[in-house]
Amino acid sequence: MSQHDRYISPFSTRYASDEMQYIFSDDNKFRTWRRLWVALARAEMDQGLTNITPDMVAELEAHVDDINYEVAIEREKLVRHDVMSHVYAYGQQCPKAAGIIHLGATSCYVGDNTDIIVMRQGLELVRKKLVGVLAKLAHFAKEYKDMPCMAYTHCQPAQPTTVGKRATLWANELVMDLAEIDHRLATLQLRGVKGTTGTQASFMELFKGDADKIRAVDASIAKEMGFDPKAVVPVSGQTYSRKVDAFILNALAGIGQSCMKFATDLRLLANFKEMEEPFEKNQIGSSAMPYKRNPMRCERICALSRYLMVDVLNPAITAGTQWFERTLDDSANKRIAMAEGFLAADAILNILLNVSDGLVVYPKVVRARVMAELPFMASENIMMKAVKKGGDRQELHERLREHAVAAAAVVKQEGKPNDMIARVEADPAFGLTREEIEAELSPEAFTGRSAEQVTEFLRDVIQPVLDANAEDVGQHVELNV
């Protein structure tokens, strides 16, 4: 069969990066199994198991990377067990050490510990891309911190903000996601050596009841695999708690939530013609409508985010249905749900890196939309100016209300521009000239502390993140489609 006559996940062909695909590849998985077998043998030897020698450990180390997949595949056809098939294949390459591979361990020693290690690698890559996005949004927010634009509540015009201030809202949610990823990384623990039901009974047998040696084995393996020696779960059944998977996928889904919010806002702004995602020179928006400039990258962010947020249900239900010390109905679901959750998060961030690197703003449209609404928003200032010239505040308030209703009707029912200023100018109750009225129509006067908030946010929140992760700033992504 060729790649064209079988199903291949779009994550592999269209969306996810090569780096994330490798992290969840068989090669990374089975190399990690072998590294864990080396770490186990070394730790057991160091704690006094005389049947394990330095030559055996060296032999195992020499064959960590040259995996004889064909042997493992053929063996699995016979024994129907993936771990024992790879134990056999490894033993074929390491005849001296064949008899001590996997000593005292159960399948979850390699399976679960590898899952934790792989998820840590995935979280680190996600974290790197989050920082890259924050750097780009910070640059954008700084550039546009002073540009007034309409803010919307209920998707209706509210009060002016600035383009840069709105960008800080997007960035701030991603900062929250980064904190959650950091928390997951900081609290991630290996399963360690726990045996078939978590009691470590097999290791008590190996070490003649010496619990200190078992604890030392756990610490040694954790250290060799790049974890703090104390970062081993204190208790477990056969597996580490599947709540860990649920916690991690929830953190990834949080990224999906933030990115969907960003992408949805940008799709709406594209409809308003205020902002757009990058549009390539030869990009086609529609097969039927040549003029179309569809926000397809942001639409894809929304689509993948929806998938990621729904995927959260898988580990949640799995965690709740783990009977007693474990059941195997976690396995098939976990293989799909966790890997694709990471691939989805990676794909979303790839697109967001690309989009945030080339956001397009149309300043004249942005200002025109503000000016179309500003007469309504400036009504209180106009009223105060008229009162200072001798007008009656209560009468002027009612007349402004009537003018606003009439002007809104002109806009909505007749499709004409907002004529509220002309109505106020013609009303003798106000006694204001056109110049006096227009003096109150500066958008910048209505943006409050927007620009200052941007400066403070970038200085106090974003810059410390960028300073601490300088190597992750400046990422550039080319999308496959």
Predicted features and spans:
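Long, amphipathic alpha-helical stalk/connector segments used for oligomerization, subunit docking
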Residues: 307-393, 399
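Short beta-alpha connecting loops at secondary-structure transitions
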Residues: 21-25, 71-73, 283-303, 325-340, ...
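A conserved active-site cap/scaffold subdomain adjacent to cofactor or substrate pockets
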Residues: 241-274, 283-344
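Active-site-adjacent "gating/activation" loops or surface patches in catalytic cores
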Residues: 211-242
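A helix-coil-helix interface module used to build multimeric assemblies
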Residues: 2-201, 207-222, 285-286, 296-300, ...
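Amphipathic alpha-helices that form helix-helix packing interfaces
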Residues: 40-43, 126, 130-133, 137-140, ...
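Glycine-rich cofactor-pocket loops
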Residues: 142-164, 276-292, 325-332, 357-377
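Active/binding-pocket-proximal capping segment
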Residues: 276, 399-406
